[in-house]
Amino acid sequence: HGCKGDDFCDGDKDAIGRIAEYEASVGVTAIAPATMTLPVEELEQILHTAAEYKKETKDCRKADFLGINMEGPFISPAKKGAQDARNILPCNVEICDRFLKASEGLVKFIGIAPEESEHAAEFIREVHERVNVSLAHTNADYDTAMEACRAGANHAVHLYNAMPAFTHRAPGVVGAVFDNKDVMAEIICDGIHIHPSVVRATFQMMGA
């Protein structure tokens, strides 16, 4: 989302540049910043600004800007975390395409909570060849998450956080990810969001 006092959703090219320069200074060579759940029109402007930054910036001192990870607005109010519930929407193909257009194809991941729409599988089938679909900020149970994966969801963020806990009787989204080898998972390895033991176990199960 950001660092050093700058946020990707500031919608400011200079802020993106400072983020990219800081990341490069600590060894991160490429970034795909995440958005917050904001009004659609505001997100479109942020995405447009990012596309302009990408076209204008050729600086080896900055991390390469690979794309954008949209954590919202198609998420669950029950797992919204720091997101503003007033801006949460059910997944919508037209709005998704607006995001892709505004970003000039820079949006690489779009997060959804599949339990929040009876048309989630249809949405995934419609868009998954244009953008990677993530299970994100979701309260889905195992069966709902499995249906989303079968429809074409191929990514989960951030595994264990902002989703149901993994238990032996209710494996939830985490269990569905473990059961789908084509699904890539992102995890927050700061030792706070997830216990280091769980990070190690996840790498043992899923690999790098």
What is the role of each PLM region?
Residues 4, 17-46, 62-76, 103-115, ...:
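Divalent metal-dependent hydrolysis catalytic cores, especially in the metallo-beta-lactamase
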Residues 40-45, 115-120, 133-139, 186-204:
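Active-site glycine- and acidic-residue-rich loops that bind
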Residues 70, 77-172:
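Divalent metal-binding pocket/active-site signature
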Residues 144-208:
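Active-site-adjacent C-terminal substructures of enzyme catalytic domains
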